[in-house]
């Protein structure tokens, strides 16, 4: 279908069979749960779209044709300054399937070496070490407003047993 709007990151198309609705076509993204000893390395990130600062896992958008693991390595370094010795795929999720086809590839990063973040000009990000037990308890209590973060922490907890 011909897009009704195009941006540098996504484009908008009419929804098949529902001309009054639209679909956001997105290149996909990555989200990383960085494990640093008994802590998770999360970020405090100001989200202009909602006007709030959230505690969340590092994440980012895929470049056209980019391998998801390559994007995850890049985003972890940019947002936290960390380099991971070990990477594991952690599945995927669809963050907003009612209107957007973004597929979010999930990764666990372990064996971290911390360096300086390489933030983009518009990013307002602070890295935060959170004890795993505290993060798991917070996620179970619904304290994370960011869905990908809650899902990843709870999946990690269920994997640990």
What are these model-predicted stretches?
Residues 6-11, 28, 100-103, 121-124:
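A generic structural signal for well-ordered coil/turn residues at beta-strand boundaries
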Residues 1-31, 36:
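Acidic, metal-coordinating catalytic segment for phosphate/diphosphate chemistry
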Residues 40, 52, 101-106, 125:
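Structural motif
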Residues 97, 114, 122-161:
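Nudix hydrolase/Nudix homology domain
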Residues 24-26, 30-74, 78:
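Conserved Nudix-box catalytic region and its N-terminal flanking loop in Nudix hydrolases
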Residues 10-19, 93, 97-115:
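Active-site-adjacent beta-strand/loop module that shapes the phosphate/pyrophosphate-binding cleft
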Residues 14-16, 34, 108-110, 131, ...:
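Short, well-ordered beta-strand micro-motif
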Residues 57-89, 107, 121-122, 131:
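The catalytic Nudix box helix
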């Amino acid at each position: 279908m011909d897009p009704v709007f195009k941006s540098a990151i996504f484009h908008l198309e009419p929804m098949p069979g529902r001309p009054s609705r639209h679909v956001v076509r997105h290149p996909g993204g990555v989200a990383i749960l960085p494990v640093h000893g008994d802590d998770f390395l999360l970020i405090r990130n100001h989200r202009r779209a909602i006007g709030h600062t959230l505690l969340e896992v590092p994440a980012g958008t895929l470049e056209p044709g980019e391998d998801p693991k390559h994007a995850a390595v890049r985003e972890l370094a940019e947002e936290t300054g960390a380099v991971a010795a070990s990477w594991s795929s952690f599945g995927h999720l669809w963050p907003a399937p009612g209107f957007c086809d973004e597929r979010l590839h999930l990764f666990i990063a372990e064996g971290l070496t911390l360096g300086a973040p390489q933030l983009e000009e518009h990013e307002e990000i602070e890295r935060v070490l959170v004890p795993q037990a505290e993060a798991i308890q917070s996620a179970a209590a619904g304290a994370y407003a960011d869905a990908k973060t809650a899902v990843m922490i709870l999946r990690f907890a269920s994997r640990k047993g």
